[in-house]
Amino acid sequence: AYDRFMAGGLIHNLRLPARPFQFVLAPMYSFKTQSAVGTGMLAYHIFPRQYFQRISLALHGNSFHHDQSDLNLSKPLYLRHQKLAPSVQFVFKPSSARSTVQNSLMLKYYYIGEEAFRYQRDLTDSLIRPKIISGDEQHLGRLVFLHQNKRTLNPYSYNLDIQANQQFLKIGLTAELRIDYHMPERAFYVRAFGGKFFEFDPNQSSFSIQNQYLTATYTGNNDWIYDGVYLDRNAQSGWKTQQIAMQEGGLKIRTLMYASPLGRSDNWLASVNLRSDLPFSFPLKLQLFFDAATFANAAQLNPSGNKVLFDGGIQLNMFKERLVVYLPLLMSKDFKDYSKSVYAKNRMLQNMSFALRFHPFEWMDQQKEWLQLLQ
């Protein structure tokens, strides 16, 4: 978001059949920040004869800007981050050539380097101005096991995601099931999530890792490892803050103006997300959705005393669900009270949210789709 309009190129060697060595590089120039930015990935694939269908060694990196300040300045300053993430993925051989089951295990390490602002008084005019300094370096180890059954009817998947560093351990289990109706291209979708968070040093400031906590509604400030594409990661108001992601709790309503948003937990969180195709044809790809979540000490943390947060409404899917717009029509009391206290008008529009499912370098398992987009 802070880099705004960017121009650059896309350099890649993607083709079918896949080559052992593949790369995608996207160097760009940001006209807003007047600096070079970009992202890219290198990968080398090994195809063993036994046990594994594929072993992929990859390195993903990017550098963009994630915040700005123009306090008492004629020209704003922008904070940059750098990310390096080497990984190895093991795709296990199926039991037979006709098997619809696929299992994979990924090990990944993240290095995140961020700049930060230090605000200090300028002795020349006694005004407080920001200064860019080197911020904290973040490290994360991640293990993801994914099981998929891509059968024609009622396919399902589940994944175990374990994240850890010197400050915390977070474990998440997500399961998804599509129940096909007896109608073409009509189905009922079920997603369930359960997560547990362990904090290694309870005496440290919770502010330093609050974005790593489990959350019912996943927004840009929760994506501290910069895996997703967000239009604004740090703002608390404006239409860009209406962007969410279908991660962790999967709820659709944001409460960013609270010091501690509803549904944030440093202990455990569980949720279920339901959506259904409409039984009749419609020019737009509309679905109905309903979400519910509960978490540790919910009755004490929710202002209403209720143990469950929920929302439901209509969603519009566009571009093969790469852009999804959510319109909540019903919600739990805590969400209603937040909406009344924060939004003076246009509450229905303010409660709307959208998700961008755009991960440019998840192409190792989706190469046919990305080749179509690149042509």
Q: In which residue ranges do the predicted regions lie?
A:
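Transmembrane beta-strands of outer-membrane beta-barrel proteins
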Residues: 21-25, 53-59, 99-107, 156-160, ...
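Outer-membrane beta-barrel initiation region
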Residues: 1-53, 91-101, 117-154, 261-272, ...
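C-terminal structured domain segments
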Residues: 300, 304-341
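Flexible, surface-exposed loop regions and adjacent strand-edge segments
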Residues: 74-80, 120-127, 206-213, 303-308, ...
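A structural signal for short secondary-structure junctions
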Residues: 265-268, 279-282, 306-310, 317-319, ...
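Outer-membrane beta-barrel "beta-signal"
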Residues: 316-322, 345-375
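Transmembrane beta-strands of outer-membrane beta-barrel pores
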Residues: 1-4, 13-15, 27-33, 44-46, ...
